[in-house]
Amino acid sequence: MKLAKTRFRPAPRELDLNIDYRVAATGLPRPSDFARWVGAALQGRSRPAQIGLHVVDNAEGQRLNAEYRGKDSATNVLSFALNEGEEAVAGLPLMGDIVLAAEVVAREAAEQGKDLHAHYAHLTVHGMLHLQGHDHETDTEAEAMEALETVILARLGYTDPYAVEH
């Protein structure tokens, strides 16, 4: 089910963001919100980026999570770097896709007492950091990634997303 597709080009030479809303849900961020969050996560990068951002339902989120991660449940965010493992080549864009499962994001925000848009901002930044090579497989990596997310979100005017959980 494809509901709406928006191509947002805030700075054509720097960011080509294709937003694909595949679910009708209340409280979804606007394309300009996603563009601001993606742009903040890219701050300081000199190479351009081509990003696909897909907002999906639980069924599609579960299918993708099972297919690519071997986990048979929907998750909040998935990231797919199209040039993963390749060296950054001058002039070539960072390319990848971020998938957000709207129902999972809304449920988590409610359960954790978080503002829905703040949670979308956090997960969008989290996904963008994965596309740029950040990970959280070890405690050290997780701490570094969480710290970077917190700094980026603070610049956007959001509180520490981990303060609620710790």
Curated annotation (Swiss-Prot):
Organism from which the protein derives: Laribacter hongkongensis (strain HLHK9)
Known EC number: 3.1.-.-
Top-rank EC class of the record's enzyme: hydrolase
Name of the featured protein: Endoribonuclease YbeY
Location within or outside the cell: Cytoplasm
InterPro entries xrefs: MetalPrtase_cat_dom_sf_prd, YbeY, YbeY_CS
Cofactor note: Binds 1 zinc ion.
UniProtKB keywords: Cytoplasm, Endonuclease, Hydrolase, Metal-binding, Nuclease, Ribosome biogenesis, rRNA processing, Zinc
Residues given in the record as Zn(2+) binding sites: H126, H130, H136
Gene Ontology CC terms, in alphabetical order: cytoplasm
Cofactor dependency: Zn(2+)
Protein family per UniProt: Belongs to the endoribonuclease YbeY family.
Pfam families per record: YbeY
Main location: cytoplasm
PROSITE patterns membership: UPF0054
One biological process term in Gene Ontology: rRNA processing
Function: Single strand-specific metallo-endoribonuclease involved in late-stage 70S ribosome quality control and in maturation of the 3' terminus of the 16S rRNA.
Any one GO MF annotation of this record: metalloendopeptidase activity
